[in-house]
Amino acid sequence: MNSSDWKMFFLTCADVLGPGDLLPFRNESWCSWTTFSRLRSDAGYWQSGLPRRADIGDEWIGDGGVWGQPFAYADIAHIIIPREFHWRGILQGALDEGIKQQDIDVLSSELNKHAIAHRKTNLVLEMKFY
């Protein structure tokens, strides 16, 4: 997967799934991802909304956006986009929660139009490179 494919992947996600945010209750989209660097360190994953169009660069996800720090496309090892995600937050002074749906079927169809390889199950759409 080259940088232009990654850029198209993230732009397609932004267009199909909507804007992301750091907090799930303010999101239209949600994902988990890890990098090769992090796999070598602690094997952890980050969670956040998908990057907004303004965060998506030619070679990386930019600093200070939805993901909070830069991520080079070449370092992304695995990204998971769930069909639905649970959110919880304080809205109008009260705890609220719910489930949001993500149309990974439409996303998969759009990614196929751009020849971007991915895997889709009944639970997630993912790209894994390890």
Which residues are covered by each model-predicted region?
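Minor-groove-contacting beta-hairpin "wing" of winged helix-turn-helix DNA-binding domains
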Residues: L125-F129
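Structured alpha/beta or helical-core interaction and ligand-binding surfaces enriched in interleaved
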Residues: M1-K120, Y130
